[in-house]
Amino acid sequence: MLLLKHLHILPMAGPGPMNGDILLENGKIRALGRELSAPGAQVLELEGLYAMPGMVDAHCHIGMWEDGNMIEGDDGNETSGPITPELRAIDAINPFDRCFAEACAAGVTACVTGPGSANVIGGQFAALKTRPGSVEDKLIQAPLAMKAALGENPKRVYAAQKSSPQTRMATAALLRRALLEAQAYAKKRAEKEGADFDMAKEALLPVLRGELPLKIHAHRADDILTAIRIAEEFHLRFSLEHCTEGYLIPEAIRQAQDAGAKVIIGPLLMDRSKVELRNLTFQAPKLLHDQGIEFALMTDHPVVPLQYLPVCAALAVREGLDEDTALKAITLHGARAVGLEDRLGSLEPGKDGDVAIFRGHPLDVRSRCVMTLIDGQIVHDQR
């Protein structure tokens, strides 16, 4: 048992901020309260420091594009074909990439990482803790989601190869075809004579059954609407990834969210490096929040280094978003966006003992994370 004493606690659930203690036991949060006692527990006096849930990045590519490497550590896009649902992030992640340690030291304790957006269907994402160790040591869930992409990226990659897709029409058609072929495959597999095993089609069956959400990369408003259209056609669970121009079509986003879609915004701390980013703005979080839309913030690491997730939230506050919503966008709403809110994202009894402790408010860019705990264990300590 570990008892953290006399903290300013930002629990992201319940009645709100409080001054008090956090008791951790067997990797979980056991209790929050004032002047807690626990015979036999290790006690840490942390008066004046801030405690918040370990942060959650709902979309990144950590370990897939390794820091400081080029092709040697570039394992995020398999560009031999545009439909590759059978690919698994866990087979490409380098768990010893130093960026995991840097994220952990910044208070980011969980991340969702996977293939990039070169392919119409790119493969399977995984959720990891940022603790030291192998993929198996870090693993929360795999697969967590299936990656799909609309817009410029698949067009650019395959036009250069003089193959399909070269237009948005072809991108949407390839996505539909893959889903339709997987449906037909499932039907034939269920029949008496069966069907020959197909690894790619097999990988799409959990998506069609609603067991695995589709993470759909879409920046431009029309691509976002295409993502919604196709997901609704096939009755899929899905999330809108990046959603850069989502603030231009709030009614469509809200209707999709009311039907179960998740929204993950970002990366915002970047240049407008392509045409579909021309309406990129840090005002987007506030504009969506004002329309009643819940969202998470992402770094899209390595686009924005994972350790700067709280900086992204702070800059959204500078542009008018309230602090509570900004913090939730990198904690509870991040966990909710990827279906892990039962374990992550808030300081509540029964949830994983993932805690980030700061000297100063976490959204003050001058503040430093002085301690990080994952599953109740201290994995970073700079007090």
Where are these regions (language model features)?
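Histidine-rich, glycine-flanked metal-binding segment
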Residues: I9-G54
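Active-site core of metal-dependent hydrolases
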Residues: A89, A186-T281, A296, R336-V338, ...
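Metal-coordinating catalytic core of metallo-dependent amide/deamination hydrolases
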Residues: A126-R229, E233, P302
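C-terminal cap of metal-dependent C-N hydrolases
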Residues: H6-P11, R336, E348-R383
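Metal-associated gating/positioning segment near the N- to mid-region
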Residues: L49-P115
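Active-site gating loops and adjacent loop-to-helix segments of metal-dependent hydrolytic enzymes
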Residues: E66-I93, R131-S134, A145-V157, L208, ...
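Divalent metal-coordination and catalytic microenvironments
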Residues: L7, I22, G27, G48, ...
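His/Asp/Glu-enriched, well-ordered alpha-helical/loop segment
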Residues: D67-G68, E72-S80, T84-P85, P213, ...
